[in-house]
Amino acid sequence: MSSITTQKPNITVCGSGSGGLAVAADLAMAGCRVNLYEIPAFSSNLEPIREAGGITLSGLPYYGKTGMARLNLVTADPAAALAGSELVFVNVPAMAVGPFLTEMAAHFEPDQVIVVTTGYWAAFRFRELLTETGAFDRYIFTEMALMPYLSGKAGPAAVEIGNWKRALYLSAWPATGNQKALAAVQKVYPQTRLCRNVLELNFRPGNPGVHVQIALPKAEFFFERARQFRFYGEVSRCASKLTDAHDVERMAVAAAFACETDTWPDDCRTIYELEGSNLYEQHGGPADRHAQKWNHIEEIERLLVEDICYSFIPMEQLASVAGHSTPVTTAMTDLSAVLSGYDYRSEGLTLAQMGLDGLTVNEIIDYADTGRYR
């Protein structure tokens, strides 16, 4: 439980899924003026919130208050949603970030700090739109490694927070905006820490997650029989071994790009205060809130697409630039495609799509730092 110690900033929260409702409700209960925005295609999701007069918040929010969270504005109008806000949190899956930025970018206001809480190389993927609309001189664009909460919808206008992150990691693109971004976000989440650049941020554990590593050892269950289940309650010792092996590859590629990062177990000790030396020991017990959360197969299928298409595949390609190989990551990608029937590689994020094709390691680092090609 915490409190805002500086002047309460005005907030815009984007996305009406569980992540967006969790951020909107908790910060509104903390005293922020909160606008909730949804793109027009999904504006019907806002009607229950308007009818209820806000969002019912339960569980374990960061600011410790539960009940009815009253919002300043609930809208599908991007200009109205963004007006007067210091911070803009975009809380949607990787594949949904594009539609939100396309609707909003022209309406970003001077000095606003835009935070995509799911990372997944958002800055590089949308670099042209960001450059055209003022990411270098008008507003600050940032990525986080993870959403601030473990949450789930408890109804069309209700959200339950199962846990909150004791550490959040952030970087701006270009990295010259890091200090201003950090100062703004720490007004509401003082546990936020800075990564050197968006390269370092995207090499952190979290996003990528461990959904592939958990699913593969129990492939028959997840790909043939599972419909509703406690996903983290299915963590096996084999999943731990895959996680450790992936960590070795991920951390080696990160080091080649002058980035520091943690293992998954070390990160879980930091952000969730979980004890244990590996994935199984941390998530395999009844005390773990992740293991208590119910999931649907459709949610896990989406998470596999995110982790593989937006993390595993670009990491393979960055490894190649640095002269490294990623045999475990490659094997998990290809085996997941065979067992799920989903062609991840046809949708995987490429260096060309990220604007990094043909660049050297040092040129990629420089691009992350400055936003400029040499």
Residue ranges, per PLM feature:
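NAD(P)+-binding Rossmann beta1-loop-alpha1 motif at the extreme N-terminus of oxidoreductases
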Residues: 2-61
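Conserved beta-strand segments of alpha/beta enzyme cores
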Residues: 33, 72-73, 140, 193, ...
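Rossmann-like NAD(P)-binding element
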Residues: 64-108, 112
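Rossmann-like NAD(P)(H) cofactor-binding subdomain of soluble oxidoreductases
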Residues: 94-157
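Predominantly flavin-linked oxidoreductase catalytic cores and closely associated redox partners
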Residues: 129-194
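Active-site-lining helix/loop region of Rossmann-like oxidoreductase modules
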Residues: 166-267
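NAD(P)-dependent Rossmann-like dehydrogenase/reductase catalytic/cofactor-binding core
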Residues: 240-374
